[in-house]
Amino acid sequence: MTSISLDSLKPNKGARKRKTRKGRGIAAGQGASCGFGMRGQKSRSGRPTRPGFEGGQMPLYRRVPKLKHFPLVNSKSFTLINVASLNSLKEGSTVNLDSLVKTGIVTSPKYPLKVLGNGNLKVKLVVQAAAFTASAKTKIEGAGGSCEVFE
């Protein structure tokens, strides 16, 4: 067995393939048309065409309109309720998603509760929700109630 040294290292058989020299005569194997076929744009000099080029036809990426306002990827969804719909509840009661379902104000409690500030509140309530708008928070606290944020 021979010892391995840096000067004795060789690549495996067939690992280093020789580059084909195109257009160097028929005997070289890639002479004449160099493997590009007979005629056409792909056989001419200056090839290949750029990606997306459709031969002068208006390309797809220019035919399609530039659409704006794509939906957010990780958008949060909420069960929305306005402050005005809380007026029918008892004074001093605690309001959360479960209590709103029991009273029938919310019919499909699929997502966490978010309170919006449309309308006026005349009842003092303790509201527990995942999120509040700024106007909803001021109206609830203005009526003497409190806002508790939780997930």
Curated annotation (Swiss-Prot):
GO terms for molecular function: rRNA binding; structural constituent of ribosome. SUPFAM superfamilies: Ribosomal proteins L15p and L18e. Keywords: Ribonucleoprotein, Ribosomal protein, RNA-binding, rRNA-binding. GO terms for cellular component: cytosolic large ribosomal subunit. Part of the 50S ribosomal subunit. This is Large ribosomal subunit protein uL15. Residues 13-24 have a biased composition (Basic residues). Residues 1-58 are annotated as: Disordered. Transmembrane segments: none annotated. Belongs to the universal ribosomal protein uL15 family. It comes from Prochlorococcus marinus (strain SARG / CCMP1375 / SS120). One of its GO terms (biological process) is translation. Binds to the 23S rRNA. It comes from the Bacteria. Residues 26-38 have a biased composition (Gly residues).
